Amino acid sequence: MAAVRGLRISVKAEATATTAEPRGPEPEPMEVEEGELETIPVRRSLRELIPDTSRRYENKAGSFITGIDVTSKEAIEKKEQRAKRFHFRAEVNLAQRNVALDRDMMKKAIPKVRLDTIYICGVDEMSTQDIFAYFKEYPPAHIEWLDDTSCNVVWLDEVTATRALINMSSFPDQEKPKGGENNEEKTAEKNKKEKQEESTDDETEEGEVEDENPSDIELDALTQVEEDSLLRNDLRPANKLAKGNKLFMRFATKDDKKELGAARRSQYYMKYGNPNYGGMKGILSNSWKRRYHSRRIHRDVIKKRTLIGDDVGLTPPYKHRHSGLVNVPEEPIEEEEEEEEVQDMDEDDRVVVEYRDDLQPFKQSRDRGAARRSSASASDSDEMDYDLELKMISTPSPKKSMKMTMYADEVESQLKNIRNSMRADSIATSNVKNRIGSKGLSDKVVDVRLLLEEKRQNNNGLRQPNSIVKSDVRQRLGKRPHSPEVKPPSSISAPRREPISDVHSRLGIPKQDVKGLYSDTREKKSGNLWTRLGSAPKTQEKTSDKPENSVASPEEDDSELQRVWGALIKEKGESRQKKSRLDNLPSLQIEISRESSSGSDTES
């Protein structure tokens, strides 16, 4: 059997293993017997075990690599030899000097230094693109945001970062005068040597190169003050302003990291909007952030469902429409912890959110989001798997459709629908009637033609008094049944009825004699002409007082008919002179009701 070994891991809070004194060589393990435990110590620092969660924003325009160490002594000596060979004398530029920087000495003086990274402070009101544009002469690889006022600019090599720091910044103001005096002395000495060399150049032939000692080539050696400042890693002021801001830079260290809760305390996000939460401005609560994360995950699930819906055979329940926000990042955002002490945002991109009505710029932001997804870390892939799992859980199963149906079933379903609709209509009408209340026949608006037809039917059915329908204006308007005429004495108690209104009452002509108009002889007349024309006027009352058994001759009927027609025409002309023709029927009914009500009041 193989020997059983035990693994013992010792983790130190700080990486002090490198600075500790080296121990002697460990003794070789003795032969381990069967069943005996052997301890193997493994030393790791706590920072190595904790993953790096800092967010990096790459330069899409491309980075730059120097390739050779131009700050080394050998490279500077070759440059000077080449310049003397071609008799080239460049102007003295204090910003770009040939400074030989010993990086090994820097690493010893500053153990945690990052020579490929420059720490910059004073970047208020500056975005990521503004910083990339500031270092366009030495394009960096990416940027690490620390807070609103500072960030780390990272290059792919140490040489380019060193060149950018030396050429784009100067020494602090306190040591600047001393350094300036030394530089002036050096420039004066160089000018003297150049004059001496020009006098000796005439003696040398063209194409010949003088044998020079490399040690004689002078470099811009750093003064003791400048060297001490670099070893202390002091902040160096930048040579030019950026958006009115005075920048300071130095080499970054491993301690220059984003603090917890920096995004929550960011004034830049409060002023310009947080692109990680849809460009919302101001202070965002934890509950609102959780709701936003849940909606974001749900939206991503719907997006992926639409992409693979055709392959699986499913269709999305609805389409999601985005808002009019521009520059909103499309990559999934890691959820924050509920405790405020642990809250930290990986997303810290400086993007000014713009609100527009058109969705055309939104497509560009989606393209940028797709490009970012391709360069995302391995943590994003885990979140994608989580979204796919959510999608498979939330996707509904396809609905089963009935394939075999009978015609009788379809007819029955149609009948059920018709019955249900009829019931619903009846219930609706009954509810309306209950709310409005039932109306009698007296409230209905009746047309004049309907009144004439009703009068004709009443005249035809005068012989059956039980079938007479009351059509008085007062009855139609809901007045109390009061008859102004005197009942004739009769032994049989007949039902009281109201007098039928004639043409005169319908045309608005006041009645001349109400009591003498209706007599028993009129009830005996059976001619259709009398029923259509109504009762005769006052001038024809004497002709209507004939005995019941007498039969009028045709000539008398014709003359009487002519007189009636003449009287009607005359009355019609008079009515036209008094008032205009009635165009609106309801107004006619109102006038009649007023006359009838006034007549009933006077008679009563």
Swiss-Prot record:
State one molecular function term (GO): RNA cap binding
Q: Which domain of life is it from?
A: Eukaryota
**Which keywords fit this entry according to its UniProt record?**
Cytoplasm, mRNA capping, mRNA processing, mRNA transport, Nucleus, RNA-binding, Transport
State where composition is biased (Polar residues): 458-469
Q: Chief subcellular site?
A: nucleus
Cellular location of this protein? Nucleus; Cytoplasm
Where composition is biased (Basic and acidic residues), the residues are 173-198, 350-370, 495-505, 539-548, 569-582
Motif extent (WLDD motif): 145-148
GO process annotations (BP):
7-methylguanosine mRNA capping; mRNA transport
Which residues fall in a compositionally biased region of kind Low complexity?
A: 595-604
Q: Give the compositionally biased regions (Acidic residues).
A: 199-219, 331-349
Q: Name one GO cellular component term.
A: cytoplasm
What are the boundaries of the region Disordered? 1-36, 168-219, 319-383, 457-604
Keyword Transport tagged: yes
Q: Which InterPro entries does its entry note?
A: NCBP3, Nucleotide-bd_a/b_plait_sf
Region listing for RNA recognition motif (RRM) domain, in residue ranges:
116-177
Q: Which family does it belong to?
A: Belongs to the NCBP3 family.
Tell me the subunit arrangement. Component of an alternative cap-binding complex (CBC) composed of NCBP1/CBP80 and NCBP3.
Task of the protein? Associates with NCBP1/CBP80 to form an alternative cap-binding complex (CBC) which plays a key role in mRNA export. NCBP3 serves as adapter protein linking the capped RNAs (m7GpppG-capped RNA) to NCBP1/CBP80. Unlike the conventional CBC with NCBP2 which binds both small nuclear RNA (snRNA) and messenger (mRNA) and is involved in their export from the nucleus, the alternative CBC with NCBP3 does not bind snRNA and associates only with mRNA thereby playing a role in only mRNA export.
Name the record gives this protein: Nuclear cap-binding protein subunit 3
- What is the originating organism of this protein? Gallus gallus (Chicken)
Give the gene symbol: NCBP3
